[in-house]
A protein has these predicted regions:
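Conserved N-terminal beta-strand and adjoining loop/helix that marks the start
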Residues: 1-22
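Short, well-ordered beta-strand micro-motif
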Residues: 12, 26, 86-90
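A generic structural motif
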Residues: 13-15, 26-28, 76
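Conserved Nudix-box catalytic region and its N-terminal flanking loop in Nudix hydrolases
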Residues: 18-61
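Short, charged, solvent-exposed linker or helix-capping segments at domain edges/interfaces
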Residues: 96-100, 115-117
C-alpha cells in the first residue's frame, strides 16, 4: 500500500449574508480547475498552520482560523494518495500572492458552481453555517 501524503488547505471567506464571498484559486496541476488553496505540511508544522500558510502563499489572504471543516478528503494523483484537511478562515487582510495563481472572490452559489470537485463543494456547503455565525469577541 502506498504512503498517504498529508496536506492542508484553507476555505477562506469574507463578508456575510448577501455580501458573503468565497476565495478560490486556479490549480497549477490542472489548467482551468478552480480549487481552495492547499498544499504540503512542512516539518514541525501543524495541519492548521499549513492551511493558513498555504492560503497566504497561494492567494495572499490572511485571517482568523475558525477550525477544521469536515473529515480529510482523500484523492489519488500521479501515483500517490493524498489526504487533505481543510480549515475555515475568516479573511482579514489581503496582499499579493507569491505563486502566480489566479484568485477569485465569488458569491457563495457561484463558488459552489465553479469548484471543480464535488467533494470540495460538499465541504463548502458544510462550512456555510459557520460562515454566517456571529463573530465571537
Amino acid at each position: 500500500m502506498a504512503v498517504t501524503v498529508p496536506q492542508a488547505g484553507g476555505i477562506a471567506f469574507r463578508g456575510s449574508g448577501r455580501s458573503l464571498s468565497i476565495l478560490l484559486v486556479t490549480s497549477k496541476k490542472q489548467a482551468g480547475f478552480w480549487i481552495f488553496p492547499k498544499g504540503h505540511i512542512e516539518h514541525g508544522e501543524t495541519a492548521a498552520e499549513a492551511g493558513v500558510r498555504e492560503t497566504e502563499e497561494e492567494a495572499g489572504v490572511t485571517g482568523d482560523l475558525l477550525g477544521p471543516v469536515g473529515a480529510p478528503l482523500e484523492y489519488d494523483w500521479a501515483g500517490k494518495r493524498y489526504s487533505v484537511q481543510y480549515f475555515l478562515i475568516r479573511a482579514t487582510a489581503e496582499a499579493p500572492a507569491s505563486d502566480g495563481r489566479t484568485i477569485a472572490w465569488l458569491p457563495f452559489e457561484e463558488a459552489l458552481a465553479r469548484l471543480s470537485f464535488d467533494d470540495t463543494s460538499r465541504l463548502l456547503r458544510e462550512a456555510r453555517p459557520r460562515m454566517e455565525a456571529p463573530r465571537r469577541a
